[in-house]
Amino acid sequence: MTIQDVSSSGLSKRILGVTTKRRHELLSQLESNYFYILDWAKNVTDIKEQYPLLPLSETLSIAANIGIIHPQDPKNKEPIVMTTDFYIEVQKGMGVEYQARTVKPSNQLDDKRTIEKLEIERQYWQRRNISWGIVTERDIPLEIVKNLKWIRICVDWDALDLSEYEILQAKKLLSQNLTQRNDSLTSICADCDRELGLKTGCSLAIVRNMLQTRELLVDLHQPIHPRKKLVITKTQF
């Protein structure tokens, strides 16, 4: 299923998953925000979005049994395949667990028709003994989302034109200065660029990559401001 297959509010976007190494099509800002959280979670091993509830005959049967109208194509009134926003694979000890999650703004949960469609979803996943739940904006910490958006960067190491040795030296120097100095992140990165003879911006890109790969750990509940000190809680260097 693609973005073109579903009506959207104009906030749809495609995001490359760090966990999955593939592009995901998210249909709203709320879905995107939740995706960032899932993609960061260490125990999440796969994420599928707009997961189809098949066979269609099963959701039709559920709707008939509870006496509600199954979702239809507004043009021809034919029943359509329902979807759950996220189908997630989660590592649990030596095994895996599957979870289904529907993302909805909290102000839609009082709508009668929305509740009816959610009940079809709930019963569909209940039959499969798969955990199903609703995620609203109240469950998504926005400060963490903002930070995750900022640190997500696909570094083009070829464009930076750095050897593995230069990258390692930069990581060591940045880690040392970030933990020992009280200067802003941009100031420390600029100093590292000058000291190691790197192109302007190289060190900042490396820091963002180190945050993404967890070589540097920070409290993501606290806002990251490049012009302020970046408080490191743990480093691999």
Predicted regions span which residues?
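Electrostatic, structured charged patches in enzyme active sites and in nucleic-acid/phosphate-binding
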Residues: M1-F237
